[in-house]
């Protein structure tokens, strides 16, 4: 069995990133893009600055921003955002168009 090649730190001396780091960054990009559709960019900038002052430019800061934005978007949708079905009154049952067999009534 051959051994996996050793991972070397980047040339700039920073420690190597974990495989999940890219995932966190990608999720943050996606959720920020969605948040910009629903919230004032000035509010999002202020939130990002607040989290940056608490956590710096770290993955923990990115994770915290993801958590806050997820909660804000969920609450926004539940309050009745017109772009979402979450929190909207329900329509009729889509299965009601299917006739019920006579022996099951």
Swiss-Prot record:
Keywords: Activator, AIDS, Cell cycle, Host G2/M cell cycle arrest by virus, Host nucleus, Host-virus interaction, Modulation of host cell cycle by virus, Phosphoprotein, Transcription, Transcription regulation, Viral penetration into host nucleus, Virion, Virus entry into host cell. Residues 1-20, 83-105 are annotated as: Disordered. It comes from the Viruses. The modification Phosphoserine is found at residue 84. GO terms for cellular component: host cell; host cell nucleus; virion component. The keyword Transcription regulation applies. It holds the Pfam family VPR. InterPro entries: RetroV_VpR/X. GO terms for biological process: symbiont entry into host cell; symbiont-mediated arrest of host cell cycle during G2/M transition; viral penetration into host nucleus. It is found in: Virion; Host nucleus. Stimulates gene expression driven by the HIV-2 LTR. Prevents infected cells from undergoing mitosis and proliferating, by inducing arrest or delay in the G2 phase of the cell cycle. Cell cycle arrest creates a favorable environment for maximizing viral expression and production. Interacts with human UNG. This is Protein Vpr. It comes from Human immunodeficiency virus type 2 subtype A (isolate SBLISY). The gene is vpr.
